[in-house]
Swiss-Prot record:
Keyword Membrane found: yes
UniProt signal peptide: 1-21
Gene name as annotated: ompW
Positions of transmembrane segments: none
Similarity comment: family membership: Belongs to the OmpW/AlkL family.
Name recorded for this polypeptide: Outer membrane protein W
Any single biological process term in GO: transmembrane transport
Source taxon at top rank: Bacteria
Entry keywords, A to Z: Cell outer membrane, Membrane, Signal, Transmembrane, Transmembrane beta strand
InterPro entries from the UniProt entry: OMP/PagP_b-brl, OMPW
Organism, as annotated: Salmonella typhi
Any one annotated GO CC term: cell outer membrane
Subcellular localization: Cell outer membrane
Length: 212
């Protein structure tokens, strides 16, 4: 009976308090699949070709979070480069675009430092850089060339939840909405074009995390 009591007390200690805490001063990293789903639109020539479309893409997502207090966190979202196909209803796929959207968030975690489940919300800023953008053969056949996109700054919002498995490990899910507005610069028949493009994606991530 004494051994059982000792074991029960040890288990209670393990399952309570800081055993599951997101605590002030703590740092943790999450990793998992992150999917970018644009809610796209375009102006100019691209906008008049009907059905402007940017494909979804999934890459490895990483988040790095520092807890300033038991409830306030600061998070950086990073990922391997996303690759999107761009097209219109009139032309089909015409180009491939690569981008990186690092996003810095200020977060509020609900509950307290003894909670195993920590829902959270966040607001912050997104910076998106575009690179290795090119028209495919289909785009080139229509007289398109020299594609580039202007880097973008915009606001971002987030909701998510962490489930704390033990003192070191957690699993989580998070959704971001990002304001990504850019300008597509290209030539059509040798004439320079500048079209406004709105990506404004939803980003979904399921992750496993480790706390340091």
């Amino acid at each position: 009976m004494k051994k059982f009591t000792v074991a029960a007390l040890a288990l209670t200690t393990l399952l309570s308090g800081s055993a599951f805490a997101h605590e002030a001063g703590e740092f943790f990293m999450r990793a998992g699949p992150a999917t970018v789903r644009p809610t796209e639109g375009a102006g100019g020539t691209l906008g008049h070709l009907n059905g402007f479309d940017v494909s979804n893409n999934t890459q490895l997502g990483l988040t790095f979070t520092y807890m300033a207090t038991d409830n306030i966190g600061v998070e950086l979202l990073a990922a391997t480069p996303f690759r999107h196909k761009v097209g219109t209803g009139a032309t089909g796929d015409i180009a491939t675009v690569h981008l990186l959207p690092p996003t810095l968030m200020a977060q509020w975690y609900f509950g307290d430092s003894s909670s195993k489940v920590r829902p959270y919300v966040g607001v912050g800023v997104n910076y998106t850089t575009f690179f290795d953008n090119d028209f495919n053969d289909n785009g080139k056949k229509t007289g398109l060339s020299d594609l580039s996109f202007k880097d973008s700054w915009g606001a971002a919002g987030q909701v998510g939840v962490d489930y704390l498995i033990n003192r070191d490990w957690l699993i989580g899910a998070s959704v971001w909405y990002m304001d990504i507005d850019t300008t597509a610069n290209y030539k059509m028949g040798g004439v320079q074009q500048h079209d406004s493009v709105r990506l404004d994606p939803w980003v979904f991530m399921f992750s496993a995390g480790y706390r340091f």
